[in-house]
């Protein structure tokens, strides 16, 4: 069925049918997608797990009230993402990418094809942005939001801070001969277990850290003696699961699966950067975080404001003065961890 690019609801349905590109950090740590909020503001509540002991009472005495684990709640206006593409008549007179050299495609057909491709492309840029938000939260506990004012050049900066405190400081860097990587991971796991009450099972590392682990003397000391106890501790058989995602192996004694995440993004200045730093590592509990989306309000063709409760809200605009078609995809999203103690960051070098 053809897509009606002039109708926002039709475009929203089309995006929902599209298969979203994979995003390792989002899929691993923030896979839950609750219903979209009906306003642009989202209540973000964070908490630390309590460890209160039940009080004893003497015979015949009544109960004793205990204090609940506290939480902090903040009301955020979910940041708006709004990438767009523009099509003008000159583009329609040229052969599209991968189109036959000798083509019978009309400009109208080429326009429909380009807009369908743009719809998928714009969705991908939003997912990349959410993946960057996930990387920032996992490595710093904060998410810096930089947007542009109406002039298109002035940068406005805001920040969502979850007051994250689980940075692991190492006594010996992992690229050094005396590094005890196994014990460092054990201590980091125990810290998460103590504060979050759950065993972390996923370790995501930058591209250099895989080599540090596989070359580490303290780990190879166990592997060099192939007895039953040592073999049951580690299993390393690196393989690519997808482009830029490499499964390194499993540390069975700590219940940890190790992944090297090599994916990069291009910043506003055109520089290529890694989502996870080359020497960074994140140990965490998977499948608990949420992607909370908020409603988007747009001006419709009748010059009235309409609110759309959707994850992705495409909008089509035709300007007859400039003879341009603009397709924009809007999305409001805040990433919310279940608890702020679900992960720990390790600067390995």
Regions found by a protein language model. Give the residues of each.
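Assembly/oligomerization interface modules of large self-assembling protein complexes
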Residues: 32-101
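Ordered core of a single globular domain
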Residues: 183-240
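Sequence/fold signature of self-assembling virion shell proteins
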Residues: 219-349
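Extended, non-catalytic scaffold segments that flank or surround catalytic motifs
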Residues: 50, 55, 154-164, 179
């Amino acid at each position: 069925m053809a897509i009606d690019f002039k109708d926002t609801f039709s475009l929203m349905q089309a995006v929902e049918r599209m298969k979203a590109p994979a995003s390792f950090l989002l899929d691993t740590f923030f896979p839950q997608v609750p219903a979209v909020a009906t306003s642009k503001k989202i209540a973000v509540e964070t908490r630390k797990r309590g460890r209160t002991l039940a009080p004893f009472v003497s015979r015949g005495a009544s109960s004793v009230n205990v204090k609940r684990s506290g939480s902090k709640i903040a009301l955020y206006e979910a940041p708006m993402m709004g990438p767009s593409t523009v099509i003008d008549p000159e583009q329609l007179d040229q052969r599209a990418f991968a189109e036959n050299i000798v083509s019978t495609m009309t400009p109208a057909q080429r326009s429909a094809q380009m807009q369908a491709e743009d719809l998928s492309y714009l969705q991908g840029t939003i997912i990349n942005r959410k993946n960057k938000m996930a990387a920032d939260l996992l490595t710093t506990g904060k998410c810096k939001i930089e947007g542009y004012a109406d002039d298109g050049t002035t940068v406005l900066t805001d920040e969502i801070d979850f007051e994250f405190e689980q940075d692991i400081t190492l006594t010996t860097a992992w690229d050094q001969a005396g590094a005890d990587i196994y014990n460092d991971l054990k201590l980091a796991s125990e810290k998460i277990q103590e504060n979050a009450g759950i065993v972390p099972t996923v370790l995501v590392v930058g591209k250099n850290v895989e080599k540090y682990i596989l070359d580490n003397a303290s780990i190879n000391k166990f592997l060099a003696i192939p007895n039953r106890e040592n073999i049951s501790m580690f299993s390393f058989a690196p393989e690519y699961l997808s482009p830029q995602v490499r499964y390194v192996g499993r540390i069975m004694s700590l219940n940890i699966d190790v992944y090297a995440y090599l994916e990069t993004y291009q910043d506003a200045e055109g520089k290529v950067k890694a989502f996870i730093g080359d020497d960074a590592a994140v140990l965490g509990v998977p499948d608990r975080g949420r992607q909370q989306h908020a409603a988007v309000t747009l001006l419709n063709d009748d010059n009235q404001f309409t609110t759309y409760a959707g994850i992705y809200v495409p909008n089509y605009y035709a300007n007859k003065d400039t003879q341009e078609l603009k397709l924009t995809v809007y999305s409001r999203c805040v990433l919310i961890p279940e608890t702020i103690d679900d992960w720990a960051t390790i600067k390995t070098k």
